[in-house]
A protein has these predicted regions:
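Terminus-proximal functional modules
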Residues: 1-92
Length: 92
């Protein structure tokens, strides 16, 4: 029996995602999802020993392709998908 180790499929519809290496956290959130133009907001945070939630360090917008590349790069580097690490603000 052949068992393949395929990566999970990238969703075609917008979805939030979280990655962590245990100290740093990335939150991927779709902000523009039109047929020909998709962007995600990526927020980076870092856990500090005396804090209840990660310290938010940086926020940037990436194209869908850039976000997918970053996600795959982090997974290859040992990061893991995780549950939400903070309550992100609601979309307007």
């Amino acid at each position: 029996m052949h068992v393949s180790r395929q990566q999970p499929r990238i969703p075609a519809i917008p979805a939030e995602g979280w990655l962590s290496d245990g100290r740093q956290v990335l939150h991927f959130r779709p902000v523009i999802w039109e047929r020909w133009h998709q962007e995600l907001e990526v927020t980076r945070g870092e856990w500090l020993p005396d804090q209840a939630a990660p310290l938010l360090k940086r926020r940037e917008r990436l194209s869908r392709e850039q976000a997918i590349a970053l996600w795959r790069q982090k997974l290859e580097g040992g990061w893991k998908a995780c549950k939400p690490q903070w309550n992100p603000p609601k979309l307007p």
